[in-house]
Amino acid sequence: MHKSCIRCLLVATAISAGSLSLAAAPSALSSRAFGDDTKKEKKEEDKYTKFFKDKKVETARGKFVTLHKIDGSVYLELPTKYLGKELMMGAKITSTTDPDYLAVGSMNSAPIVFRFEKQDSVIVMKAPNSIVYRRDASPELQKALELNYRDQSVESFTPEVYKADSSAVVLKINSLVTESSPFFEIVPSQQGPFKITSSRNSSLTFVRGLKAFDTNASVRVEMNFSVNASLMGVLTVAKDMPLTAEVTYTILPVEASNAIPRFADARVGYQTTRKVSFPDYLDQSEPVYLAHRWQLVPKDKKAYAKGQLTEPEKKIVFYLDSAFPASWQRPIREGVLRWNKAFEAAGFRNAIEVRDFPKNDKQFDPDNLEYSCIRYIPNSQETIASSNWTDPRTGEIFSGNLTIYNNVEALMHKQRFIGTAAVDPQVRSSRLPQALFEESLSQLVTQEMGSVLGLLRNYAASASYTTDQLRSAKFTKESGLTPSILDGVTYNYLAQPSDKGVRLINDQLGVYDLFAIDWGYRYFDLKGDPAAEAKELLSRVDKRAREPYLRYAPEQRYAVDPTVRTEDLGNDPIKTAELTMKNLAFIQSNLSKWITNDPDSRKKKSLYLAIVQGYYLQLKNAMSLVGGVVCQESRLSTSLPRYQVVPKAKQREAFQWLLREAKDFQGKADRNFERKGFIDVSYYDQLLEFLVKDIYDLRSRIIIASQVDSKTYSLGEYFDDLYQATFASTIAGKSPNHMERLMQIAFIDKSIAGTVNPRNATPGMPYSFAGAPASVGGKLISLTSTTDYSDALKSGRVNYGGGDPSASIYPMANVPA
C-alpha cells in the first residue's frame, strides 16, 4: 500500500478512538454526579487482606509488633524496619498444676537475643555470635573476627504475606511458642531437691492469649507434660505424672546498648559473662569476664562528681506480688531496700524501689520480661530463689526475680531454733513469734537479693572475725556477725547464754558488701571507656587487697581452705565447735519440753535431725584444719601469698581432737528420746560411716599441703596418729566400741589396699603409701592453675583478663580409695 494511504488510515483510526473516548466521558460524569456506584470498578483486594479474609482471627496490636492467632497458630506481624535489628525473647511460667516442679514466675532458660534477616525469599532467624569481645579491634582484626566468628543461622521462616506497602511481614512462629523449642526449657531438669525428666504432649497445646504493648508483645500458651521426678536422683517420687503449665513468651526490641561493660576482678565476687579478646599487643587470645550489673547513671552528674548522693536516671524497680500475706509484705520490702545503704556507698540515693502490683495499669504484666517481680508461691518448699537476666553483649542486668515459697517459715524456724534456742527463750516453741518471723524473713530476702544484683556468695567472710569477738555485744552490734551478708551464715550459733546483748542474726550489710557494690556500680565519667574504668578499679582493689574483711572466696567443691566453709563462724573452728556443741546438747535435752502441739512428732524429728547435722557440721569445720591451705586470689603487684598452709601444730591438734570426738559421737545421742518411737533409726548411728570416710579422705588434703610446704604435717604422721587413736583400746587390753571397730576395719582395708606385698604392711602409714609425701604427691597431686595476672598498670595497658570470680582457686588431689 502507498505510504500516504497508510498515514491517512492511521489518522482516521486515532480520530475514531478519540471520538469514542469523548463520547463516553459525559455518561461517566453523569453517573458520578448522581451517586450511582453500581458502575464503579472494584479494586482488587491486596494479598494481606486476602490472607485474613473469612478466617477467625484474634489480633493484638501494639506500637512494636502485631500478633495474630488463627486456628491455634500464632503469627507475628513484624514491621520490616526491625529486619536486621536485634530482638530478645524469653519464656516465664504463668501458672502450673504443681508448684513443686514448676514455679510461677520462673524462667528456666535464659532469654535469647536474635534478629530476623531477609535472605532470598525467606526470613532467617540469626543468633549473634557474641563470644568475642570486639571493642577497640583494628579494622584488620575486625574483618578476621567476622570471618571466623560469624553469626549463626538457626531457623528460617517462609513469609505468609507482606502488607501492601511492604511495611510489615507476617511470619508463622509456632516453632518458637507452641512447639518444642531448643531455645526454651519449660520444665527444668532440677527443681529444689527434685531431679526431673519430662516429655511434652504436643496434642495438648493451646494458645490462651495475645498481648501487644508499646515496647513488647507476649503470647500465653498452655502446655502439657508427662513428668518423672526423683528425690536427689535416688528416690522416685513421680512417674508419668501429668503436669499442665501456662507459659508466657515475651518478645521485645533490644536497643543499641549504651551500657559500659565492666571487666570482672576475681577478688570481688560478681556473676560474669565470659568472652574472648584478641588484644593487639598479645600474640594470643585471652578470656574476658564481664560483670553482671544493672546500669545506673546519676541524674545529676555534676553533683555526683562532687561526692553528693544522687538518684539514678533509671532506678532498679521491683514489683511485689499482691498475693503475699499482709504480714509478709513489710519485711520483704525492708529486706530488698536494705541494699540502698550499699548503693549510697557507690554514690546513689534510692537506687532500688519496691512497688505494689499495679491494679489499673494495663501495660503491667508480671510475666513480661520488662518487669522485675517478687513472687509468692504457695507450696511445700522451704526456700527463697532468685534469678536475673543479662544482655550477653555487655553483662547488663535487665530483669530480675525473687521467688518466695510459702513454707519458708519452716526453714526459718528450724535454722533459728537450732542456732539460737540455747540463748533466746523466745524461740523455744513450735513457731516463731511474729516479730522474729519478720526479722528472719527480712534477713533471708536481703541475702538472696544480693544475687539479683549480680553478686556471688562470699564464703570467706564468716571466718574473718575471731570466735571471741562474736560473743561480744558491743562488737556484734557495730560489725554484725560477718563482713558480708552474702556468706551462708544466718544466726550466731556459738553465742552462749552468758553473752548478754550479743547479736543473734546476720541481718546487717557488712564492709565487704558496701565495697562490692561500690566496685560494681560506681559511675565513672570516662567517656565510656571500659579499659580506663578497669585501670581505675584494679588500682582501687589493689590498695585494699590486704584488708582481711574485704577478702572474697568462692564456694569450694572439695574442702581445702578451712576459712571458706558453708555455715562456719569465727576464725577458730575448734573453739567454735566446742561452744556450738555445748548449745546443741542443751537444745537436744529440752526438745520435748519446748516443742509442743506436735502430736505426730514430725516437728521434733525434723529438729532432732537438724541437731545431729549441726554436730556433724562442727566436726567437718574443725576437720578442715587438717591439711588445710588458705587460698587467696592475688595480683603480682600486691605480693600477697596465694597459698598458706595451716601451721603443723594446729593441724595435729585438730586431727587428734577430731579422733576423740568421733569415737564418742554415738554418746551424744539421746537414746531415751529415740526409744520413745520418735526416731526409727538413730541419726547418730547413721553418720558413723560418713565420719570414718571423712577421716580417710583427709589424705588428699595432707598431700596437697605437703606439696605447698614440705615441712608441714605429713602423711606418715597422720597415719601414726590415726593408728594410735584407732587401736588405743585394743593396745590397752580393752574392748573397742562400735566406732573404734569401724575405724579398725577401715584402717586394715586401707593398709593392704594396693600394696605390692601385704606382708610388708606395718603399723602406721600403709605400705602402699611408703615414701610419701613426695612420691605419692608427685604421682597423685594436681594443683589447679590460677590466673597469673600480668601487671595491668605497666605501660598503661589493662589486662582484660581480670579473672573469673566464680573460678576455683583451690588446689586439688586424688587419692586411691
Sequence positions of predicted segments:
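Extended catalytic-interface subdomain
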Residues: 385, 390, 396-404, 445-453, ...
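Stable alpha-helical elements in mature extracytoplasmic
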Residues: 328-335, 437, 441, 445, ...
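Bacterial N-terminal signal peptides that target proteins for export
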Residues: 1-10, 17
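Auxiliary tRNA-acceptor-end handling modules of aminoacyl-tRNA synthetases
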Residues: 29-324, 342, 357-412, 416-432, ...
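Conserved catalytic/binding loops enriched for acidic/polar residues
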Residues: 462-817
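The catalytic-center signature of Zn2+-dependent metalloproteases
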Residues: 34, 356-377, 439-496
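Zn2+-dependent metallopeptidase catalytic core
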Residues: 83, 325-351
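C-terminal segment of classical bacterial N-terminal signal peptides
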Residues: 16-26
